Amino acid sequence: MPYRTRWFCVAVVVCLSAISASSYAQTAPGAAPNSDATYQQLRNIGLSAEAVTVNNFELKRDAATFLLRSGTVCFVAPVQGRVTGAVFVGDGNMTLDPPSPGEAVSLKRLTKEDKFSEDFSRLALRFTDSTYDQIKKGGTPASGGCDAGLLEDSQHTTRKKLNYNLSARILQDLLNAQQGGLFVAFVHGKHYDDKLMYFMDPDGAPGVAPEQVELTSYGENKSGTWASFNFSSEYRDGLGAGGEPNSRIHIEHQELDTTIEKSAHLTGKAITTFVSESSGLRVVGLSLFPTLRVDSVKAEDGQPVSFIQEDKNDDPDFYVILAKPLSKGDKFTITTTYNGKDAVLNEGSGNYYPIAREDWYPSKGGGLGDYTNFDMTFRIPKGMKMAATGSLLSESNDGSQNVTVWRSDIAQPLAGFQFGRMKEEDAKLTSPDFLVAAYANEEPPDWADKLRGGTMGNLSTVSMMKQPLSEAQYAIGLYTGYFGPLPFKRLNITQQTACTYGQSWPGLVWLPICSFYDVTVRHQLGLDFSDNIYWKVVTPHEVAHQWWGQTVGFESYRDQWMSEGFADFSASLFLQSAYGKNGQKEFLNFWDEERKSLTERNADGFRAIDVGPVTMGYRSSNSKTGNIGSHLIYPKGAYILHMVRMMLWDRQDGDQNFKELMQDFVKTYGGRAATTEDFKAMVEKHMNAQMKSFGDGTMDWFFNEYVYGTALPSYRFETASFDTDANGDVVFNVKLTQSGVDNNFRMLVPIYIELASGNIYFLGRARLVGNSSFEQKIPLKGLKDKPHRAIVNYYDDVLASSN
């Protein structure tokens, strides 16, 4: 489920907040965008005459320490009586000691040094905390002499490179009665990188929110996050895994009225009701696609509300400025009108491609953790069909427009749509009671239309939509049995013009157009992927996201492995079940490909299994490791759940224990975001006696190895022979060795035998700790014929090297 990104790899989380109650409405006449006087002062800020000389001055900001050995600090001009920035020229040093052990290891791996220590001679700072007072107190008055270009360079970086409106973020704190906690350092280093940024924000650092601290580089050819974590105090207080809540608002309801013309130009009106989750809130940040330009923002009484939205090519973050602050728990409603192109593309012949998936309306942004109720009206050209999230309440024609009205059955993390000149075919399920509707465009898009003729045929997908319809229908029934029922009763399976990826929103799936084509056409298009499994699993994977990502959200990029990994795992269930007698072969082939994805080196020479734990998410991708993130999150997340399934499986009840675990997880966390630790607690609730005794009553051993670690054991039979005892029963002589791990690594390793008939029989699980061996003579009572062979890890029960 890909996300549009800015300078980081997870969806942007600019802290939001909003309003309700006409008593707080803007009283001044409507103003042009970005016209707020205080904001303009921040936007055009420069250095003042105030400066101090510092010697061996230490400024500690959470895990970072800035030592200004000698030099001059010049401050920016005050705004609203507060100084929000400074530049330093001289001799300085920055050290970083992450409070998270995993981040400390990752930083050492990245720098190839035990300690992060960066010297610098130039430094720019922006802040809303006590930095000004501390530096002023620790220095002696000076006459200036700083480089004004340092401040200008930091402004250019945030606006042009990172597309992040730092001035608006500072305004949030300036208009709050309480002192802020924002601190941003632009470090021109001499050793690692001359373009480092240390970002500390109680609301969440933009690239890694809700985590508050981030060290990142932003050079042209060297970019990516070096380290990120919560405040050090949260780890000391036992909150480091999940962190303290730091959202400014919760959006309670969205009423969206959207018109999309034949040209794909979008015009929208959003009535957004939100609840303040902080006190003193005046500036609310919202996520809106950059090319959708805001025309106006109004309060409930119709009075205009001031707003910020810079040029689409710069830092176009959308902020609303309230006339008066909100208290925690206050509701506020705003109406935003906006329009623009490029949020939706006209791909020709009645095909449309929504580019803006999560920000085609003013939203909270930040992924799949906040759940909102939606009422939506869509107006599209007459003769076209609309498929959207939620339930269809009505459809009518109004002049030249097709008008549909939709409502979410429950609160959902996102809303979305697909439309065009489409055909629809439905399939009704009785168990569960569910409707699957498939949509295919009547004509191919322009890019495909140019390929018509010859061996390619006409590339029409209408006749081919029965397959994704039947796959989705089967997957819904299968997954309901494993994970429990969905909270809604309809799923729209649509075709998108993108060829090689799918995506899933609540009740709505976008499938790649090329998944509708057969093998011959895909070969002609050069889409012979090495594993070829992709085309078999793209539909069941995206359907599985109705549970993983939509019904159960994820708290942050640290937890996204559950969404993508669980969906990938679900696809393996589909292969095993839906392919009949070939299911076992497809299932084993799937896990073989997942392991290869983790253990084969990419073009940059890295293996996904080695670059970091799965909780690093897309942060594992950077200019050094390449685009390796998806090769970690999808297969590693899938393997983790697969291993849990196999540990819970037993001869008598099969998957029953696993089903109870997953259904409990969905029931407990449906309609909200879950964390990795939430899932761990759920596994511990349902673990069997063997798992419990092996881990002293917890699953720490397993999660430390595979979720928070990068372990990859190897297994080898030193001995695997069969004798017979005096009664003629087979005796299995086994010595199984575990290697390639540390001394604390432990695993329950499954052993199987293949009988002479070819049937596979599960013997049991060997308990292995560290680099050691399990050696035993096992009588197989009642078995007279010697088995063909013994097999370790037959179903890829344990993620291990292939030997």
Regions inferred by a protein language model and the residue ranges of each:
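N-terminal, polar/Ser/Thr-rich
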Residues: 26-267, 295, 366-368, 700-705
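Solvent-exposed beta-strand/loop surfaces of large extracellular or lumenal domains
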Residues: 63-67, 73-77, 81-124, 130, ...
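Hydrophobic helix-coil surface modules that form long, contiguous segments used
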Residues: 233-238, 242-271, 275-282, 287-290, ...
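Glycine/proline-rich low-complexity spacer/linker segments in large multi-domain proteins
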Residues: 241-245, 328, 337-378, 430, ...
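Amphipathic alpha-helical substructures
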Residues: 278, 487, 630-734
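Beta-strand-rich binding/interaction modules
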Residues: 279-284, 290-301, 387-388, 696, ...
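Zinc-dependent metallopeptidase catalytic helix centered on the HExxH motif
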Residues: 352, 369-370, 375, 473, ...
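Acidic/His/Gly-enriched intrinsically disordered linker/tail segments
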Residues: 564, 568-643, 647, 669-670
